[in-house]
Swiss-Prot record:
It comes from the Bacteria. SUPFAM superfamilies: Restriction endonuclease-like. It comes from Verminephrobacter eiseniae (strain EF01-2). Pfam families: UPF0102 (PF02021). This is UPF0102 protein Veis_0630. Residues 11-31 are annotated as: Disordered. InterPro entries: Restrct_endonuc-II-like, tRNA_endonuc-like_dom_sf, UPF0102_YraN-like. GO terms for molecular function: nucleic acid binding. Belongs to the UPF0102 family. HAMAP family: UPF0102. PANTHER family: UPF0102 PROTEIN YRAN (PTHR34039:SF1).
Length: 144
C-alpha cells in the first residue's frame, strides 16, 4: 500500500468537527504517525511483534526509537521509520546520517540495559515515501 493511500484511510477523529484534511494538507506530525502506522502494519504482516513504540531516553540529547519489535527467533529489531514526500535529497533514506545512527544506537543501548539478558538485535530502517511501496531495509546499519 502506498503512503498517500494509507493516510487517506486513517479513521476519522472520534470527536465531531470538520472533515479530515486531505492527505496533502496533513501536518508533519500526522504524516509521521501515519508513516509509523504503515511501517508497523508492514512489519507485523511479516510476523514481527510490537514491543515498544516511540521509546525515548530520559533527559536531553538522547535518542528515540520509532519501533521496537521482536522476530520469531527472538531477535530484537530497532526500527527507524523515515518519511518523505518525494525523492529529492536522497528521499526518505537520505536523512539517516551518522549523527542520527548514533542517537538510535544510544537509545537502543539504553533500552537493552533495562533487560536482564540482552537478546540478539539489529537496526532496520523502513522507508515510506509518497507514491512508492514501503521499503524495509534489514540490518541497515550496525552499532560500532
Amino acid at each position: 500500500m502506498k503512503f498517500l493511500e494509507f493516510l487517506g484511510k486513517r479513521p476519522p477523529a472520534a470527536a465531531p468537527g470538520p472533515a479530515p484534511a486531505p492527505a496533502s494538507a496533513a501536518t508533519a506530525s500526522e504524516r509521521g504517525h501515519a508513516a509509523e502506522d504503515l511501517a508497523l502494519a508492514h512489519l507485523q504482516a511479516a510476523g514481527l511483534q510490537l514491543v515498544a513504540r516511540n521509546y525515548r531516553t530520559p533527559g536531553r540529547g538522547g535518542g528515540e526509537i520509532d519501533l521496537v519489535l521482536r522476530e520469531r527467533d527472538r531477535t530484537l529489531v530497532f526500527v527507524e521509520v523515515r518519511n518523505r514526500s518525494h525523492g529529492a535529497f536522497g528521499g526518505a533514506g537520505g536523512s539517516i546520517g551518522a549523527t542520527k545512527q548514533r542517537r538510535i544506537i544510544f537509545a537502543a543501548q539504553h533500552y537493552l540495559r533495562r533487560l536482564p539478558a540482552p537478546p540478539p538485535c539489529r537496526f532496520d530502517v523502513v522507508l515510506v515515501q509518497e507514491q512508492e511501496p514501503v521499503q524495509w531495509i534489514k540490518a541497515a546499519f550496525e552499532a560500532q
